[in-house]
Curated annotation (Swiss-Prot):
Catalytic activity: (S)-4-amino-5-oxopentanoate = 5-aminolevulinate
Name of the protein: Glutamate-1-semialdehyde 2,1-aminomutase
Modified residues (N6-(pyridoxal phosphate)lysine): 263
Organism: Campylobacter jejuni subsp. jejuni serotype O:23/36 (strain 81-176)
A single cellular component GO annotation: cytoplasm
Main localization (coarse): cytoplasm
Coiled coil: none
Family from the record: Belongs to the class-III pyridoxal-phosphate-dependent aminotransferase family. HemL subfamily.
Amino acid sequence: MTNKKAFKEACKFIAGGVNSPVRAFANVQSEPKFISHGKGAYIFDIDGNSYIDYVQSWGPLLFGHCDKDIQKACQKALHKGSSFGAPTLLETELAKLVLSDFPHLEKIRFVSSGTEATMSAIRLARGFTKKDKILKFEGCYHGHSDSLLVSAGSGAATFNSPSSLGVLEDVAKHTLVAKYNDINSVKELFEKNKDIACVIIEPIAGNMGLVPAKQDFLEELAKICKNNQTLLIFDEVMSGYRASYLGSYGINHIQADIITFGKVIGGGLPAAAFASRAEIMDILSPLGGVYQAGTLSGNPLAMAAGIASLTKAKKKTKLYNKLGKLAKKLTQGMKKLADEKGLPLQACHVGSMFGYFFTKDPVSNYQDALKSDLALFSKFHKNMLENGIYLAPSQFETGFICSKMDDKIIDTTLEAVRESFKRI
């Protein structure tokens, strides 16, 4: 069966033919590749084509596809049982592994997805502060729970409307939206709203393309939260163990009240978490009145994969330095080639994460990102795919370097970039 036929058949039985919208390739006016298998830095589609994979399952695969250590850990766990709905030693082992490196985090709770982690963190913040409103930032994605599917309305200092059908206005009105990297927009919202339970932010935004928050912006944001008895939530579902071993904390050293984790923490299996100090976490059921639960939360397969992934990352002290150098080489190379061709391009990296925008101006927030030339991106994406390079099929996604990549792979990629730019 070909990719084209597979997608046509999938559309008959699966809504939209995919189980997550961006996979449909609609943003690049194309159709998805159906993947048969992956190995290291490569994936292979059912037509027999191979690609250097910079999506890496949208971030979890720090060690690439089919890592032997993670596979071995999963196989060992599977032989004992895939799920029990009861505590296991693996849960405590992974909890200790995560918490040992964050002095401000004392307890953790595992869930099965990033959406669950952020949704639960917000409920926890509301329960702890006894306040109703939440503040998020335009362009930051925190999963698809109702209160977070809200984008900016007519100005950041207003109540906002849902950005998805099915989200009630009564839910959306409790979500305030500020401008990323703009502390004045935050101050304005706090001046007009005294019942903000929490501020949730991607300290390294990866869902409007890669846009890191500025150090002084985060520092001032933390002060505002502290002065207003508002909890600060860092959503590190993507950046945790990706931007550095300690995520944004390893870079900006700012201690958020709650951190959400995901992707790498599950080693490629469905796992996520939220963590905080004990006084906050202890109001979760069964100790307190904030309810959160999950049938597959902390399942042994995901815990085993997470332990193997984080243990390996922690042991390989030079890993993040290597990944950062490769990401730097890639983004600087792309920028140089674009300049030579006279194409508008902004490119950056943070650790093993990288992003690029087809725009002439620097990008520091969502409105800047929206100025990107989407038609140009679509042509570039198609050309790269034809040259064996698998990039995220959206201008507003982040790319990832894995440990199985090397200078040769980056050189191959840059040659594909050169050829792709020639054809634009």
